[in-house]
Amino acid sequence: MKRLCFALTIPLALLACGGREMPDDQGLHQDIVNSSSGAEVTFDATLLSDPVESGGHERFQVKDPAGDILEIDHNTTLAASVPAHAGDALVIHGQLYIDPGPRVGVHCTHAETSSGCPYSGWIEFQNNYYE
């Protein structure tokens, strides 16, 4: 019995350690309040507008649970398009940017890093990852 428990513990530990980041909605809100442009964020979102393709990017607006509205800039030359529509739920992992205005958004939502994207990101929709 001890061997069975030990044998099951290792795969479960690896799965837990190798998983994706969990949403931190309050952390995102604090990063916005603190103007932490460049922060790595993972958060729940509701799609406010259907994605629009423009210049190799899919752009759309989302609302987080705190009520913040963000622009998502998803590079479709590095990642698959997200087949979502207004009202759909997403989980987004990427880099926060805050431009003058202020315009708040997230980019670097792709697995393949590029200049300006220090880490990989993704968008989860209906248990599928677009990265």
Say what each PLM segment does.
Residues 17-131:
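OB-fold and OB-like single-stranded nucleic-acid-recognition modules
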Residues 7-13:
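Bacterial N-terminal signal peptides
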Residues 1-4:
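Positively charged n-region of N-terminal signal peptides that target proteins for export
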